[in-house]
Amino acid sequence: MFNQVKKTMEWGEDTLTLETGKIARQADGCVIATYGETSVMAAVTYARSQKPGQDFFPLTVHYNEKYYAAGKIPGGFFKREARPTEKETLTSRLIDRPIRPLFVDGFKNEVLVICTVLSHDLENDPDIVAMIAASAALTISGVPFMGPIAGARVGYEDGEYVLNPVVDDMHDLRNNPDQRLDLVVAGTKDAVMMVESEAYELSEAEMLGAVKFGHEQMQPVIDLIIELAETAAKEPFDFQPADYSELYAKVKAAGEDQMRAAFAITDKQERVTAISAARDAILATLSDEEQTDPNLGSALKKLESSILRGDVVKNGRRIDGRALDTVRPIQSEVGILPRTHGSALFTRGETQGLVVTTLGTGDDEQFIDALHGNFKSNFLLHYNFPPYSVGEVGRFGPPGRREIGHGKLAWRALQAVLPAATDFPYTIRLVSEITESNGSSSMASVCGGSLSMMDAGVPLKAPVAGVAMGLILEEDGSYAVLTDILGDEDHLGDMDFKVAGTEEGITSLQMDIKVAGITPEIMEKALEQAKAGRLHILGEMSKALSEGRSQFSEHAPRIETMQIPTDKIREVIGSGGKVIREIVETSGAKVDINDDGIIKIASANGEAIKKAYEMIHSIVAEPEEGKVYTGTVVKIVDFGAFVNFFGKRDGLVHVSQIENRRLNHPSDVLKEGQEVKVKLLGFDDRGKVRLSMKVVDQETGEEIKKEAPAD
């Protein structure tokens, strides 16, 4: 009934298995990849014809995690998986980026890749397994895909690269000092296609070494996919790229000069207008049939690409007139919004980001319900890219995949320099509003985010800057590496290479390569050129602010941390939370207690923090024997009076300890609610407190000294 094919190999510390032919047989290709006990099913389907008027490649990748894979039931009211989580969105992009450039040029049929996590062993991250499964499913499906690819995760521990570290070591690098790198690399047999990473100030050589290590380690996986395809692959889809050479010749003859003049304009909006006019002029020379040719868009893009690329490689001349290694003019400002906790406006050429920092308490931490466990995050970064930033009318609503991806890239770049939670017990939220964009807006978010946090008083270990690099590689092997690329250079180039870090090293690296042939030497040159650009940007940023402010904004919360014995937690909380509610209501401060006895008291008002601190201290502190306290009479009985003298602590003043004379009843001199001065004499055999009034001057609160006997 099943024509099942299964291939297995040992890879790293576990066994990798690829199998097909048993499940989802109506898909064009379906492979279940299992690494350890983590299993991901990738199913591929594709349309047999191109939609009329389709002028782009409609590839869609969906990665989804099923809670049952880890033996969990989803939270929430509906108890089922709903909209994609951030992890699912980021992994979908992680798979999309290396496979997209490998489809045959000109193929514009719809392709759908769905990766479903079926089992998770809580050790091996499903993202790498999903990438391998997707590559294998595409390879056997018959779609014109020039793969296969494979992926690998690389760690860096004690000076050694580690293949596919376990999930627990990687999900929170900030709190794992032994692990300094989380890098994912994807590539074909001959070339690296994609890199995504977060790091702890590693050098350019260490990062390049990690990329090489990952590419070497994935080679057996590529061989395994090829071995599977030799047995299970379907007949290749008969696709012949359209020949539009005649159309391109007409387009070039009609508009090359005008298009070249348009690309010589340095101002973005003027250039866009001129390019649009050049396109219209070209269309006016074409027949009706040629204007409706589905390859017209490709012909126009080829003309634009040849003009831009030729000028850069042959003449060293960029669109805006800069040298290849020059960064656009930078303007940095901080503290521009009066009521926010921290703010910065970072402008680099025609790219601008307004980044705002908000400080919160433990109550503001983000709760993350992941397959490998539940945890909280106290650092959030949200990136917004409204249509007005590029002068367009467009969709405005919840963040899309691109916004989530760019925000995570900036998050990775900055989290390496954050102070430890024990030293800075605040939740930090950054929001990057991209107000102008002409390339590298995610790196503007990094620069603006660093300045904004320092403006808020966050004690960063070092400022962070980011720069986007580009590459143009010609067929004859000549190439040019571009620093701080524009949007058009990104669109028409062969590599998008974003590097962020401090003066000491790299904290984040993202690379997307669109062509084969990029050698380690080219990557090394790009990294060195990026370092020079990054150091220049850090110098420009330091003109605005070079370290965190010593004072918070008056509108930001202050947090005081105190440690209490764990056996006192119950006393601070009280029955049903009665005591802690009283502390919050009386002081006006927010109070958070964890299971280790660490208490965080937060308020924008210093007096509120002081009041809450004193109330908690009075509950957990032990009174000192021999010390004088001010107390209040809370109850009078025949044998004495009970006095509340130390927070919630009461003690007995025996009738014989009230005055230096005999009393018929304590009520002769005391009444409930009266303030008295008492000395703690000690504790009786049952631990009860013994107090005395008669040894204390009730006016001054001074202890009455016994007169020395006469000689």
From Swiss-Prot:
It comes from the Bacteria. Residues 557-616 form the KH domain. SMART domains: KH (SM00322), S1 (SM00316). Mg(2+) binds at residues 490, 496. One of its GO terms (cellular component) is cytosol. It catalyses: RNA(n+1) + phosphate = RNA(n) + a ribonucleoside 5'-diphosphate. Its main location: cytoplasm. SUPFAM superfamilies: Eukaryotic type KH-domain (KH-domain type I), Nucleic acid-binding proteins, Polynucleotide phosphorylase/guanosine pentaphosphate synthase (PNPase/GPSI), domain 3, Ribonuclease PH domain 2-like, Ribosomal protein S5 domain 2-like. Its cofactor is Mg(2+). Keywords: Cytoplasm, Magnesium, Metal-binding, Nucleotidyltransferase, RNA-binding, Transferase. GO terms for molecular function: 3'-5'-RNA exonuclease activity; magnesium ion binding; polyribonucleotide nucleotidyltransferase activity; RNA binding. It is found in: Cytoplasm. Its EC number is 2.7.7.8. InterPro entries: ExoRNase_PH_dom1, ExoRNase_PH_dom2, ExoRNase_PH_dom2_sf, KH_dom, KH_dom_type_1, KH_dom_type_1_sf, NA-bd_OB-fold, PNPase. GO terms for biological process: mRNA catabolic process; RNA processing. Residues 626-694 form the S1 motif domain. Belongs to the polyribonucleotide nucleotidyltransferase family. NCBIfam families: polynuc_phos (TIGR03591), PRK11824.1 (NF008805). Involved in mRNA degradation. Catalyzes the phosphorolysis of single-stranded polyribonucleotides processively in the 3'- to 5'-direction. This is Polyribonucleotide nucleotidyltransferase. It comes from Dinoroseobacter shibae (strain DSM 16493 / NCIMB 14021 / DFL 12).
